[in-house]
Design a protein with these regions (language model features):
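Conserved class I S-adenosyl-L-methionine
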Residues: 1-39
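A short glycine-rich, Lys/Arg-flanked "PGG" loop and its adjoining helix->strand segment in the class I
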Residues: 122-134
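Residues lining the SAM
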Residues: 108-110
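C-terminal lobe and adjacent flexible extensions of AdoMet/dcAdoMet transferase-like proteins
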Residues: 201-231
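SAM-dependent methyltransferase
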Residues: 139-211
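Conserved S-adenosyl-L-methionine
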Residues: 45
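Class I SAM-dependent methyltransferase SAM/SAH-binding core
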Residues: 49-95
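A short acidic, Gly/Pro-enriched loop at the edge of an enzyme's catalytic core
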Residues: 97-104
Length: 231
């Protein structure tokens, strides 16, 4: 599983259009509807901790897991600034370990798509089930194959900011349903730019595949919604 390295430095800059507050409100609303208003919550694939921080601000005792040391360094800086008591763990989400169980697990921003083998997805879901309290809730979002095939596939995204720029090239293999992201990042240092290159892979899953993985993990599907809706 790929970890963000050079991109971590500019991740929040280029993701400043992501509606983290809206996502947090949406996720927290579902948690509260299911009676989870406080207690331990795991943010699986937490990245730089943007949603982790917001959920901590709502009164949840947060744990964040990510496999990128660079991303967690930024998350820790946010934690120091906010004063929130968040535990961050540098772990691969496919093999994460906790000290005990939690009331809920969330995994936002298509983190589960980075697991490119269905067998490993089922194993990850089984781990989630293992660390959930009885009656606990697992909330996650994922990109379907449609998004990779019709929206992202073989497109190039580029942005130029004052202090950094990036080129994001997508190459989608419809047979394997794997989307390759080739990232080229330039970060200003004085009068020059430092260049980073990274390659990441995500898999486009069908709804059937995901529900099968949940069933194999021993979990019950409560609901499946389109983003920001209850439909």
């Amino acid at each position: 599983m790929d970890a963000y390295t050079g991109f971590a430095e500019v991740y929040d800059t280029f993701m400043d259009n992501v509606p983290y507050a809206e996502w947090t409100e949406y996720y927290a609303g579902i948690l509260k509807e299911n009676g989870i208003r406080d207690g331990l919550v795991l943010d699986l694939g937490c990245g730089t901790g943007s949603m982790t921080e917001l959920l901590a601000g709502l009164g949840y005792d947060m744990i964040g897991v990510d496999n990128s040391e660079e991303m967690l360094e930024i998350a820790s800086e946010k934690k120091a600034a906010s004063g929130h008591d968040i535990l961050y763990l540098l772990q691969d989400m496919r093999e994460f370990e906790l000290y005990g169980t939690v009331r809920a697990v969330i995994s936002a921003c298509d983190s589960v798509n980075y697991i490119t083998e269905p067998e490993e997805l089922a194993e990850t879901f089984a781990l989630v089930n293992n660390y959930l309290d009885p009656g606990g809730l697992f909330l996650f979002d994922f990109n379907t194959e449609y998004k990779y095939r019709e929206i992202l596939g073989d497109t190039t995204i580029a942005e130029n900011r004052d202090e950094c720029s990036f080129i994001w090239e997508n190459f989608y293999d419809p047979q394997e349903r794997i989307n390759e992201y080739d990232l080229t990042i330039f970060v200003r240092e004085g009068e020059l730019y430092r260049k980073f290159e990274e390659t990441h892979f995500q898999r486009g899953y069908t709804v059937r595949e995901v529900t099968d993985c949940l069933r194999k993990a021993g979990m019950e599907l409560v609901a499946m919604y389109d983003g920001f809706t209850k439909e």
